[in-house]
Design a protein with these regions (language model features):
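Short, aromatic/His-centered strand-loop micro-motif at the edge of beta-sheets
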Residues: 141-167
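Bacterial N-terminal signal peptides
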Residues: 4-15
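Extracellular beta-strand elements of beta-rich domains used
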Residues: 87, 220-224
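Low-complexity, Ser/Thr/Pro/Gly-rich disordered linker/stalk regions
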Residues: 19-96, 176
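Flexible glycan-contacting loops in extracellular carbohydrate-active proteins
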Residues: 189-221
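Secretory/extracellular carbohydrate-interaction modules
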Residues: 66-143
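Carbohydrate-binding surfaces in secreted/extracellular proteins
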Residues: 87, 160-194
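Beta-strand-rich interaction surfaces with strong enrichment in secreted/lumenal proteins
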Residues: 71-77, 152-160, 208-209
Length: 227
């Protein structure tokens, strides 16, 4: 029985690695005007703060280094009805701050952000070809399983320390919500499956950026368009 359990766990991406603890990033904090953020509740319970991750802008590029898992947003960035939010994420040195792949991506439908009742949905990519669709409502929820899914559209880094880039988009179109990565729709859900108790209050709301712990990513082309 123990052997069977061990084989099962070893088959799950990321389970082979011990969970690396979040670290404090020197010179951390949010220095992009108008923006703020919130780290995950479990990070707060462990004594981490928003200043343990670093978020700054250089030219047209947003630079993020975590630290604790975190969401960043500008309260002025709101979207409603049908829309698409997209950005390009570059991990300059894959897995340089962690011992296994960590994801990064976009969130939409942000309501009551920064409070204990916040809700939002995010789609995030890993540099190993996987993606996840998850959210908070306010408890964490998963839309595509424990470890996410692999998809050929998601770029894979050539190796540890090598760069990998993903273009990620979340779209609301009528009664559907779609996540696209590198131009391919990788997940599609009925809005009714997301706007419900324990998940989103609405797909209307603030949009922003989401990062796992101990990750270094550069973001370009972040914005929203109406369809």
């Amino acid at each position: 029985m123990r052997l069977v359990l061990g084989v099962f766990l070893a088959s799950l991406p990321g389970v082979l690695f011990a969970q690396d603890a979040s670290r404090a990033v020197p010179g951390g904090g949010v220095s992009v005007p108008g923006w703020t953020g919130k780290i995950d509740a479990n990070e707060e319970r462990a004594g981490r703060t928003l200043n343990d991750a670093k978020f700054f802008k250089d030219g047209d590029t947003l630079h993020v280094t975590t630290g604790p898992a975190v969401a960043y947003w500008n309260p002025a960035n709101k979207a409603g009805g049908d829309y698409t939010v997209k950005a390009t994420f570059t991990e300059p040195k894959y897995m340089n701050l962690n011992n296994h792949p960590h994801p990064y991506g976009i969130f939409i439908g942000g309501n009551d952000l920064g409070t204990a009742n916040q809700s939002y949905l995010y789609c995030a990519a890993y540099g190993d070809g996987r993606f996840i669709v998850r959210g908070f409502g306010p408890a964490a929820f998963r839309m595509n399983g424990f470890a996410g899914e692999s998809n050929d559209a998601v770029h894979k880094a050539a190796g540890v320390g090598q760069p990998v880039t993903q273009e990620i988009a979340l779209s609301v179109k009528g009664g559907k919500l779609e996540c696209s990565i590198n131009g391919t729709v990788v997940a599609s859900y009925d809005k009714s499956a997301l706007v419900t108790d324990g998940k989103l209050k609405s797909t209307d709301g603030v949009y922003g950026l989401r990062f796992a712990h101990n990750t270094e990513v550069n973001v370009t082309g972040f914005g929203m368009s109406k369809k």
